[in-house]
Amino acid sequence: MIRSSTRFASSIKPLWHRLARTAATALSAGMIVTAALAALAPQAAHADETAICYNCPPEWADWASQIKAIQQKTGIRVPFDNKNSGQSIAQLMAEQKSPVADVVYLGVSSAFQAKDKGVIQTYKPAHWDDIPANMKDPQGYWFTIHSGTLGFFVNKDALEGKPVPRSWADLLKPEYKGMTGYLDPSSAFVGYAGAVAVNQALGGTLDNFEPGLDWFRKLKANAPIVPKQTAYARVMSGEIPILLDYDFDAYRAKYKDHANVEFVIPKEGTISVPYVMSLVKGAPHEANGKKVLDFVLSDEGQKLWADAYLRPVRADAMSPETAAKFLPASDYARAKPVDFGKMAEKQSSFGERYLQVMH
């Protein structure tokens, strides 16, 4: 009996050793998996730190640098979006029952429309008090982050030896046939701003768009190029030698991309307009959206706008060195004020009349 017990003990010992080794291996593997999951957990959480912005295209206003800085500073990823102002509002309206976007960037007259349509909500971000009263909605539905002045963004190498145009009248000359581009004013805010600028410069008002519409009728004979969205790359390539656009795009091309370009403020006059941001009503990542809005008005965010040759709403963010690269103040004196609220009221009806004229 003792020998049988001894033989049993001897036979069972290797089995216990094998089981122990298996258990140890499994435990070790489990610890490795647990450690790996723990290491991945912060990254997974970080990946969820997203804010969706409508109308934040990388080629426009150097949103590329701004979005990169937002992620570095806050950990929030903001995907690029190439909608224009009109397309953004249409999308927000279509998504009202189940919003997708958190924040939206708009031309100022489009912001009035967004408020009327009920697709944005109030939020007064950090540095709210630094924004001039005429550059924000008093309740906080929208606020300016920067502004630009309308003019001609000219690729001089693509002019084929022709002189740089200096006036709205110049663009109607046969020598510039097929050379002038502008964004569709029935959809893109910059296109509508250009229409308001030429109309006002030629003696029109927001109650009388006939001078501007007559100019578009004449320009139609000169075969203009009318893209739907930002056309910076097409100017740089020479496809569009002359684009009705803001000063900041031309300065970016000249000073950052070292292109042979010029910005012209037409001699008859123009306008300067603000661009604004808003928190989307029902934003799915509302807290992240608010952080984005805080950042674009922060010292760092405003300096980035200034470095991209936009006029930051917090004027002290622009350095003297950057300001010196702009055209002289005497040229900017030709940019006249406009009633942005009324500009918003007239945008839809102007768009309809423009389409009738051009089609």
Question: Model-predicted segments: where are they?
Answer:
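N-terminal secretory signal peptides that target proteins for export/translocation
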Residues: 1-21
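Short beta-strand->loop
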Residues: 120-129, 142-143, 169-172, 241-242, ...
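Extracytoplasmic ligand-binding site segments that recognize negatively charged/polar headgroups
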Residues: 56-64, 100-239
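Early extracytoplasmic/lumenal segment of secretory-pathway proteins
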Residues: 47-113
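Periplasmic-binding protein-like
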Residues: 130-133, 148, 213-218, 224-225, ...
